[in-house]
Amino acid sequence: MFRFDKEQMVIEFAGAKFGGQPGEYPTALSGTIFYARHKIVEDAKKGIFDKKAAEALINKQAEMQDITGNSAFVQVFGGTEEALVNYIDFVSEVWDGPMLLDSTSGKARMAAANRATEAGYAKQCVYNSINVAAEDEEIENLTNSDVEASIVLCFDPMDPSVGGKLNVLNDGGKTKDIGMLELAEKAGIKYPLIDVAVTPMGNGAGHAVRASFAVKAKLGLPVGSGIHNVPSAWDWLREFRKGLREEGKDQISKDVHHVCDIGANIVQTMASGDYVLYGPIDNAELAFPAVAMTDMIIAETAKEMGTATVAEHPLNKLI
């Protein structure tokens, strides 16, 4: 293991604390709720869902946080303005920790930031995300909100290299005339969470892992990603699982995906990751132990380098 010469930012908000040197703080884990085809969602456009089931999932993740010491985030996904607002209103009632405002719709993200500000729970929100595709209207809306934390995506479609990822943060790279960090600062973001933008296997997934080290070494900022998307987009794995099903090995087919899905989070954690977007919140009981174990190994090796591990760390809770 190693220590970075660069001083490392530690983020503390809404009850979560993460960042710093490898082994200092446990990795924060964010599970997604109300995602596409989530079985608890009854009407994805209006945001109608099974509240009892949703609360149970959020509580289970909170329970895993208490057991391992890894801070939990709830990543709230909504496809429409109405749905996302309904979802975050509910989550804010049953969860007082960090939650991500996530949507493929800029209008929905804007509506969510406005609603969180109006209702008084913006301080527990993380915007997802500030990136090169963000329109001026969305950035202005974020600036006028009370949201202080945001995922900052270091992805330049014109240059997916590690250098390109650093450049897009610092000066906009080959796509934008302003760096994403400067844009975040102008939008009032105090807590930037750098997402190293993992792309599919064979198309630069490794660049994102290396960028995790580079961002922390050069900038000292917390890094992470939704690296679990790599196996989901892996053509070979898809065909392999199909073959298993054709052989009547349905359970093994499911297990193979789970192993790769959860295992991907270990890769990000070992690459000095400070947070991981691990996918469906339904997988909390799989993701938390795997990442907690990884954190314990990192913390043990980091001790010999003078890194002090915080009290609420898996190394101190699970042995």
UniProtKB/Swiss-Prot annotation:
Any GO BP annotation: methanogenesis, from carbon dioxide
Catalytic activity line of the entry: 5-methyl-5,6,7,8-tetrahydromethanopterin + coenzyme M + 2 Na(+)(in) = 5,6,7,8-tetrahydromethanopterin + methyl-coenzyme M + 2 Na(+)(out)
Keywords, comma-separated and alphabetical: Methanogenesis, Methyltransferase, One-carbon metabolism, Transferase, Translocase
Binding partners and assembly: The complex is composed of 8 subunits; MtrA, MtrB, MtrC, MtrD, MtrE, MtrF, MtrG and MtrH.
Family membership: Belongs to the MtrH family.
Function text: Part of a complex that catalyzes the formation of methyl-coenzyme M and tetrahydromethanopterin from coenzyme M and methyl-tetrahydromethanopterin. This is an energy-conserving, sodium-ion translocating step. MtrH catalyzes the transfer of the methyl group from methyl-tetrahydromethanopterin to the corrinoid prosthetic group of MtrA.
Name by which UniProt lists this protein: Tetrahydromethanopterin S-methyltransferase subunit H
Origin organism lineage: Archaea, Methanobacteriati, Methanobacteriota, Methanomada group, Methanococci
